[in-house]
Amino acid sequence: MPLLTTPYAELDLIRQPEQANDPLQAFDAADEYLLAQLHEQAPDANCRVLVLNDSFGALAVSLAGRLQVVSSGDSHLAHLGLEKNLTRNGLTFDSVPFVPASEHWQGLFDRVLVRVPKTLALLEEQLIRLQGHLAPGAQVIAGAMIKHLPRAAGDLMEKYIGPVQASLAQKKARLLTATVAERPLARSPYPSRYHLDAPALELVNHANVFCREGLDIGTRAFLPHLPRDLGNARVADLGCGNGVLAIASALGNPDAEYTLVDESYMAVQSAQENWRAALGERAANFVAADGLAGVEKQSLDVVLCNPPFHQQQVVGDFLAWRMFQQAREALVVGGALYIVGNRHLGYHSKLARLFRGVEQVAATPKFVILKARK
């Protein structure tokens, strides 16, 4: 794979999760542009830099040991990528502190480097949180490939930080630089909430949660067909989002044990808050993780999953396929994976390669609900 070569370092970086013969690299021209811009400003070694939404550590690893760097974002996979790429390049895995998006930063920062996220609500929440964390003379520099840089990103920076200057394009990337100006302290519009009729739930959704304004149509199709009579089964909601699948299932299965897993810290935070609101102090596990990668083999009876079909701006079924493999490893013999998916994705044939029995539980014109038994 190509090396990331910048004025700061030459790095060998990998994506997370790792895939054999992965054609995609772990950095892009926007990373290079951000690092070149920062280097041109010649900050001293005491400069505190906050890096936001660094996909696999390209920015933070480049600056580690040279400036006072803190990394933050909503992706546990990005956090794993940062740790792996630090050690891969001769640094200790904890040499750059990481702050999950469900937590808050400490202190003031002189520079903030931002990779513009796919979800602008996350960017807005981060810009609002920056108020009170920017040192005098600080700059916020956001970077993205032009095809992934909406006009609204600059508007949000102008609204919450200060005047914005757009750079010239370079290798199809562009930077937006905001200089701190006096702005009224903003109140965050997040988390958002919506009401569900069946079951009757009020659901909290932090800024980066998928379909935070309302129930997605795949989950809506899945809910009436969740498994019943689970007894004391051990159940995982894999890619739990705001936790609605696990919560709806738990309401009908009072003796089952639940684990809610997502790679988004804000999703896990939302799921935990929603569980408490719906089920009080009933025990459950809430985990930000790389799916079921750390779960003991043959330790689950049921897995519920509405698999994602993209990682940031990359679309494909590689994450779903990986989740299916993880579910197979974690399930006991005779255990079952229940999923919902778009018809055109062909999940039935993919599951048949991993499980001894696959059946269609229900279908709509757009979705299928499948049960795969190990």
Swiss-Prot record:
**Domain of life, source organism:** Bacteria
**What Gene3D superfamilies does this protein map onto?**
Vaccinia Virus protein VP39
- Reactions that this protein is recorded to catalyse: guanosine(1835) in 23S rRNA + S-adenosyl-L-methionine = N(2)-methylguanosine(1835) in 23S rRNA + S-adenosyl-L-homocysteine + H(+)
Main location class = cytoplasm
Which major enzyme category is it? transferase
Q: Which family does it belong to?
A: Belongs to the methyltransferase superfamily. RlmG family.
Protein name per the record: Ribosomal RNA large subunit methyltransferase G
Please give the organism: Pseudomonas putida (strain GB-1)
Species lineage: Bacteria, Pseudomonadati, Pseudomonadota, Gammaproteobacteria, Pseudomonadales
In the UniProt record, the gene name given for this protein reads rlmG
